[in-house]
Amino acid sequence: MIAVITGASGGIGRETAKILVSKGWKVICLQRHDCDVEGTQSIKCDITNQQDIDRAFSMIDKIDLLINNAGFGVSGCVEFTDMREIRSQFELNFFAHIAVTKAALAKLRESKGRVIFISSAASVFSIPFQSFYSATKSAAESVSLALSNELKQFGVSVCSIRLGDVKTGFTAARKKDFAGDDVYGGAIARSVSVMENDEINGMKPEYVAQKIVEITQKKHLPVLATAGGTYKLFCLLQKLLPASLVNKIVGKMYMPEK
């Protein structure tokens, strides 16, 4: 069985690759830097570059599992965040995953394989000053749901796996744009601090990777799944409670007063 993973040089992607290798999978990692997990094959690929994607997939004969994992965060308020930063986040977190998936689909149809989008609880909870990250995850989930129906006739399954806070290098790599923080009374910095503290104290990537692999191996792949019991509860409450109340709770959590 052959798995292709984007963004496996560290964090969740790296741990997922390790588990799959231990289970006898051949794992191909697509990223700009080599994956140091023993037993994996690395193909250097900037997944925001279509030529790189085409070259990478021309080197792959078969795919049973595609895991769209690469991504990064940009924090900042809607009003002052530079449009170039917003577009760059959509390029990697959304458009690149669509391009990679499109390139893999012919081979996935042949194998009746599976497509996984690594999503976030932020897709259903629009977090203040993280709005564009939330938007990229929500957009990818929408495509994932439609794709699931489109590919059903070919025996290809599609799932978005929502994650909560995870302790990885994602936190340090986040681009923080504090432009306008004086106008917003320091709310941007306070909100980002809350987010980073939650991540630093979040789930271990090894645990999350194990949950991801467990979900990918289910006989009947769900179209949506959540890793971690607490976040499953949060997502359930989001369905049951009025949207205005959910949004108010999120605001209280991520916009602490001075």
Positions of predicted regions on the chain:
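Active-site helix of classical SDR
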Residues: 101, 136-139
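Substrate-binding pocket helix/loop in short-chain dehydrogenase/reductase
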Residues: 77-78, 82-87
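Conserved NAD(P)H cofactor-binding loop of Rossmann-fold oxidoreductase domains
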Residues: 69-74
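Rossmann-fold cofactor-recognition segment
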Residues: 38-51
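N-terminal Rossmann NAD(P)H-binding glycine-rich loop of SDR-like oxidoreductase domains
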Residues: 9, 17
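SDR active-site lid
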Residues: 153-222
